[in-house]
UniProtKB/Swiss-Prot annotation:
Organism placement in taxonomy: Eukaryota, Metazoa, Chordata, Craniata, Vertebrata
Listed InterPro entries: Cyt_b/b6_C, Cyt_b/b6_C_sf, Cyt_b/b6_N, Cytb/b6-like_sf, Cytochrome_b, Cytochrome_b_C_euk/bac, Cytochrome_b_N_euk/bac, Di-haem_cyt_TM
Keyword Transmembrane helix annotated: yes
Subunit details: The cytochrome bc1 complex contains 11 subunits: 3 respiratory subunits (MT-CYB, CYC1 and UQCRFS1), 2 core proteins (UQCRC1 and UQCRC2) and 6 low-molecular weight proteins (UQCRH/QCR6, UQCRB/QCR7, UQCRQ/QCR8, UQCR10/QCR9, UQCR11/QCR10 and a cleavage product of UQCRFS1). This cytochrome bc1 complex then forms a dimer.
Name of the featured protein: Cytochrome b
UniProt organism field: Phyllotis xanthopygus
Main location: mitochondrion
Known role: Component of the ubiquinol-cytochrome c reductase complex (complex III or cytochrome b-c1 complex) that is part of the mitochondrial respiratory chain. The b-c1 complex mediates electron transfer from ubiquinol to cytochrome c. Contributes to the generation of a proton gradient across the mitochondrial membrane that is then used for ATP synthesis.
More details: Heme 1 (or BL or b562) is low-potential and absorbs at about 562 nm, and heme 2 (or BH or b566) is high-potential and absorbs at about 566 nm.
Gene3D superfamilies: Cytochrome Bc1 Complex, Chain C (1.20.810.10)
Domain of life: Eukaryota
Keyword annotations of the record: Electron transport, Heme, Iron, Membrane, Metal-binding, Mitochondrion, Mitochondrion inner membrane, Respiratory chain, Transmembrane, Transmembrane helix, Transport, Ubiquinone
Leader peptide range in chain numbering: none
Length: 381
């Protein structure tokens, strides 16, 4: 008798993607974050759906509706904090996923990598419009400041900003459309995830050694389903500790004050996961230059497959580039910290140095290190 999962048109897709998928036998726990991102996405869509049942996207009632969710809806506080802190877990997993891709040379699977960059940008857009919805002070001013950056585009900038706002300031029309965007974008992300997986399964997964693993593959189930399940349990444990004990630790106190266009907060800053890009944005004194640097800080990831000149796949056997990689990670953490500090000396100076380092490491230092390591290889072999 033939096995149904191998022949049924729908089950065959699931089988080839999650059950009988040939997987390298040596992939480490750094490969767990793809499945964790999937779990985060499903959780965000479900909690978001339940929040949307009670939320009203009107400037007069948005803040009150969020208060109503937390106070009057059964377990509304839990759903709200799961959604807010789930976004943080989503970005932690995504940053680790990208970091692993850089470390192990996964960017050489260029189609998968490029779809991943589009996914990152789409997720950032979703998180940004979502942060505006509670209509607190930081929601309102964050929306005003970030959308205003588009006015730096020559000729069409001002018109574009007013078109996005739906008026001459961030108001009712802006909130309504941001809610619409926030609802639709996760489904676009889901579609992109399927494309991401489609391209990944065309080539097969990379592995820590960077060598071809076609001669040594094992089925995804049960080996990696069990391994991923452990990762999911650890993720949920960290998330529940955050939600139940420190629900507001990653948020901004200003967002508990209703939006007031007449009163500007002392320090306008986005959520923590955007701080590195925000630090790069404000380290450049020119508005258009800052916006370009902000966009390039993400799009520069697309250069990795192009500027890679190493004879080896990944950084496992490349000590010089490894050292530079960890400096890059430390530099990112410094940018994240600086992004949350006020715009004054010494933070502005630290931000400018860290921003220059961010781009220099990728464009200059890593390729030079690759060339040196290639020369060392020539000497030995």
């Amino acid at each position: 008798m033939t096995i149904m999962r191998k022949n049924h048109p729908l089950l065959k897709l699931v089988n080839d993607s999650f059950i009988d998928l040939p997987t390298p036998s040596n992939i480490s726990s750094w490969w767990n974050f793809g499945s964790l991102l999937g779990v985060c996405l499903v959780m965000q869509i479900l909690t978001g759906l339940f929040l949307a049942m009670h939320y009203t996207s009107d400037t007069a009632t948005a803040f009150s509706s969020v208060t109503h969710i937390c106070r009057d809806v059964n377990y509304g506080w839990l759903i709200r904090y799961l959604h807010a802190n789930g976004a943080s877990m989503f970005f932690i997993c995504m940053f680790i996923h990208v970091g692993r891709g850089i470390y192990y040379g996964s960017y050489m699977l260029s189609e998968t990598w490029n779809i991943g960059i589009i996914l990152l940008l789409t997720t950032m857009a979703t998180a940004f419009v979502g942060y505006v919805l509670p209509w607190g002070q930081m929601s309102f001013w964050g929306a005003t400041v970030i959308t205003n950056l588009l006015s730096a585009i020559p000729y069409i900038g001002t018109t574009l900003v007013e078109w996005i706002w739906g008026g001459f300031s961030v108001d009712k029309a802006t909130l309504t459309r941001f809610f619409a965007f926030h609802f639709i974008l996760p489904f676009i992300i889901t579609a992109l995830v399927l494309v991401h997986l489609l391209f990944l399964h065309e080539t097969g997964s990379n592995n820590p050694s960077g060598l071809n693993s076609n001669s040594d593959k094992i089925p995804f189930h049960p080996y990696y389903t069990i391994k991923d399940l452990l990762g999911v349990l650890l993720l949920l444990m960290v998330l529940m500790i955050l939600v139940l004990f420190f629900p507001d630790v990653l948020g901004d106190p200003d967002n508990y004050t209703p939006a007031n266009p007449l009163n500007t907060p002392a320090h306008i800053k986005p959520e923590w996961y955007f701080l590195f890009a925000y630090a790069i944005l404000r380290s450049i004194p020119n508005k258009l230059g800052g916006v370009m640097a902000l966009i390039l800080s993400i799009l520069i990831l697309a250069l990795f497959p192009l500027i890679n000149s190493s004879k080896q796949h990944g950084l496992v056997y490349r000590p010089i580039t490894q050292f530079i990689y960890w400096i890059f990670i430390a530099n990112l953490l410094i940018l994240t910290w600086v992004g949350g500090q006020p715009v004054e000396y010494p933070f502005t100076m630290i931000g400018q140095v860290a921003s220059i380092m961010y781009f220099s490491i990728i464009i200059i230092f890593m390729p030079i290190a690759s060339m040196i390591e290639n020369d060392i290889l020539k000497l030995h072999y």
